[in-house]
Amino acid sequence: MNQHQATPGTLPSDEASRHFTPLIQPDLAGLYSRRAARLRALAEGHDLADYLRLAARVAEVQASLVAEADVSGPADARAIPQEGHWGALLDRLIERLAHDVPAPVAPHLAALRALPADARLGAAQALTEGRFDAVPAAIAPFLWAALSLQCASAARAAPVPDSGPAEHASCPVCGTAPVASLILIGDRQGMRYLHCALCESQWHMVRAKCTNCGEASELDYLSFDTAEATVRAESCGVCHGYLKVISLERDPPAEAVADDLASLALDDAVTAEGYQRTGFNPFALPG
């Protein structure tokens, strides 16, 4: 694994003074479709090819369900389970996946379909409260996919929150941790945005400082490739946390959830160095 320290050049010289949008909410159907395409591309020759393709299929179904989501509910993570709208999305998700998943996955979808309403609610509450180990790993990603679609849809229908000048370690819309941070291209060339694991919002944070504690004095960037790798782990020697940085400058088709999921081996290596991940992936929930 390669390691290099942050330098002043890592931070674009004009980022602090440039006009920028503090919060971005990408079009959901387009986002899910791009994610699915990226997952399928990354699956080629990958050790986790079957799982990456399953995640791609889930993203495709999410894209097909965007128009069916109820946008009237709250976008707060802990309020979503009680609203109940996500349950109908879960049923449709299971129905559309049932005949198009690997054989070992089918029994888990059937068990999830048969789960009583109170058990579903309890599992959803556990996930949105961060008690991931309370939900079987075989069904958690499907539950999360429905919860995420509902929360993301509600977030796009609600007024954009005024998060103030402070930069946030967690999503200013729903309060959930990020999947990773993205270095963007185009009008926001070189700017960093964190991508929410639940509502799919993206919020700005300047580069070359820890996304968890805000310190800039002890940052290292770890990767299996060179310092110019598309996916690197930004690790902090102050709080001992880390979060991946995914550069669209280096690979424009890169996508937060897809590229993070395809680089879980990097998580294992960074964790072995004594760092703790400060975010999570919807298809690889902690616990």
Curated annotation (Swiss-Prot):
GO terms for molecular function: ferric iron binding. InterPro entries: FdhE-like_sf, FdhE_C, FdhE_central, FdhE_N, Formate_DH_accessory. It comes from the Bacteria. Signal peptide: none annotated. Coiled coil: none annotated. Belongs to the FdhE family. This is Protein FdhE homolog. It comes from Cupriavidus necator (strain ATCC 17699 / DSM 428 / KCTC 22496 / NCIMB 10442 / H16 / Stanier 337). The gene is fdhE.
